[in-house]
């Protein structure tokens, strides 16, 4: 199933599988969350179906002690990611870059997740930017989108304004702090 450590000529899928499992074991040993890019990829001509988060299901099952932080809400597979985050305790939704990809998809996903996913499994903001301006702009967009989604749930009567504020803080601060083992933040 895996390449042996003493094999020098490990190529193609065997090598990819070996490296993925090596990194999962490494993350498990060190209690480090494993971040994976899914969904829309920067640039053109990517095969989007290769980034479907369901392709990772075997890893979620095999490495139950590894927390997987799934980037970009898996867009356009955000509904699938909802189901994965609901059924796997070790799968977290990361909204990094997603607010830029599609603000509407983010708001709609958050409204859905409030009904279907433990909200302490959602990181509301993050990014892998090449320039600092992206951080400020994306955070502003994230705050607006989270506010819109939570306001919808308040209007529906799912929770009150104070609970919405607590949930917002949890998604922006508490969940990432816990997931990444940040103590003095």
Language-model segments: residues:
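Histidine/acidic-residue-rich catalytic or RNA/ligand-binding cores of hydrolases
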Residues: 44-53, 78-87, 103-111, 132-148
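C-terminal structural cap/anchor segments
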Residues: 72-124
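Catalytic core of soluble alpha/beta enzymes
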Residues: 33-86
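Hydrophobic alpha-helix feature that most strongly marks membrane-spanning transmembrane helices
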Residues: 28, 61-64, 86-89, 111-118, ...
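Active-site gating/metal-coordination segments in enzymes
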Residues: 1-33
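Alpha-helical packing segments of well-folded alpha/beta enzyme cores
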Residues: 19-23, 109, 171-175
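Short acidic/histidine-rich active-site segments
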Residues: 35-37, 69-73, 96, 119-140
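Mid-to-C-terminal alpha-helical segments outside catalytic/metal-binding sites
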Residues: 119-120, 136-185
